[in-house]
Amino acid sequence: MTFVDNFEFNQNTPRLVRGPFIILNSIIFSLSFILLCSTGIIIYYLNEYYLVKDLTIPLGSFILSAYMVITTIVGGIAIWKKKLGLHLTFMVFLVVLIVCLVGVSAKMIVDSGNPEKLQHKIENIWYKVGNYQHHSKHYHHGIIEIIEKHHRCCGWSKEIEGNYCVHFNRRESGHGYCAPYVEKSVESILKYLGYYGIVLSVIELILLILSGFFLLKTNKNVKSKSFILQD
């Protein structure tokens, strides 16, 4: 017994619908692939400091962007093969993706507006990185030294490190603590990623609407599903 899916997309489906679908799907694929590569590099770098488990946002973004890439590939194949089952699978993937992406993006935006909670997390990470660098080859040219050089700052705060600096060796006049600079940078990154995710969600929602429109344009044979008996 062989199962045959007799649903096929209408060959006369206007290009006005199919064209935007392919364009939007390609845009989402490109943006998600860029995000996948970026978060992969960040995770690789953070893993060197054993920080991946402390920073769930990069890991979550990596998993979500990988899911986006897979979803867009399924969508591309669904359009190419013109099969209803594959297209329905793509739509289910897309709904799950939109829900997850909106949730993660909203959390990033909310976290960026909560400086006290954010400050505590960043401070703990700075402390762990500092301890790790003191006992490893990464003491010089490590992430703390890079931050101090870039912002011309010294240490995290007076309560944490006093007059100690990785790069400047001692506190000099004009070298403030790094906490305000790092916190501001992290807040900006979280806000940027949050709105980036919201924009992607809107594009995916439009793609979902186009996908639904495709289903209305399918042709049905006399029997939507048929079974062929073979000897």
Swiss-Prot record:
It is found in: Membrane. It holds the Pfam family Tetraspanin. One of its GO terms (cellular component) is membrane. Keywords: Membrane, Transmembrane, Transmembrane helix. Residues 43-58, 105-195 are extracellular. It comes from the Eukaryota. It is a multi-pass membrane protein. The keyword Transmembrane applies. The keyword Cell inner membrane does not apply. Residues 1-21, 80-83, 217-231 are cytoplasmic. Its main location: membrane. Disulfide bonds: none annotated. The chain crosses the membrane at residues 22-42, 59-79, 84-104, 196-216. Belongs to the tetraspanin (TM4SF) family. This is Probable tetraspanin tspE. It comes from Dictyostelium discoideum (Social amoeba). The lineage of its organism: Eukaryota, Amoebozoa, Evosea, Eumycetozoa, Dictyostelia. The gene is tspE.
